[in-house]
Amino acid sequence: MLVVGTGQTGVQLAEELRDAGREVILSVGHCGRAPRRYRGRDTFWWLRRLAEESAAGRRGLPSVDQLPDPRGRLTGNPHMSGHGGGHDTNLRKFSADGVRLVGRLDGADGERVRFAPGLEANLEFADAFFDDRFRPLCEALIERTGLDLPPDDREPFAHTVPEVSELDLAAEGVSAVLWTSGYGFDFGWIDLPIFDEMGFPRTTRGVSAVPGLSFIGTLWQFNLGSANLVGVALDARHLAEQW
């Protein structure tokens, strides 16, 4: 099996296929990973608390105006798993356990597929994602609120993965390709000049410049949590207060 994409869906499917005894080749994209639990608390507990801090005007989830590049709105959510009560997913461990990692799928010619260079860079990005972007928010919340939590017990895992430039799918015995590269949105049915160059509606926390037209659940509508369950309710409450 060739699985293309390492957001949450691709990583979870690759893990399940491996556990079922399948030989899996996983095409790695530019996506982070996060521990399922940090300092004794589930990641979604942290997300919910940080979303509440944001709603109260304190330092919580990063807001859309803090993104260094608007293209960051399209970055996939960091991967982890909820299976069996939830656990971490580490691509380097996948490789050590038999999953064959390759770079981002770059093209195909018949049964031969090509992969872009930069596999190690993508793995390093995934490894650093939590410590660079999310852990500081958790630690700031602990310091501000005096939470009494156990120490960080994560252990580093080092494993070198060789770079692969191309594969012959027939020779490798690949019988199926799973595309888990995400999906896009299309607001083409709204014929109004309120969208930016990337197709996102221009709003102030969901409220557009057109009277009566608001949006909910869009990526980074207000902050990192706007497109998932930990943040959409807070955005919905804000919109309801505007009417």
Language-model segments: which ranges?
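Flavin (primarily FAD) cofactor-binding/catalytic cores of flavoenzymes
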Residues: 1-243
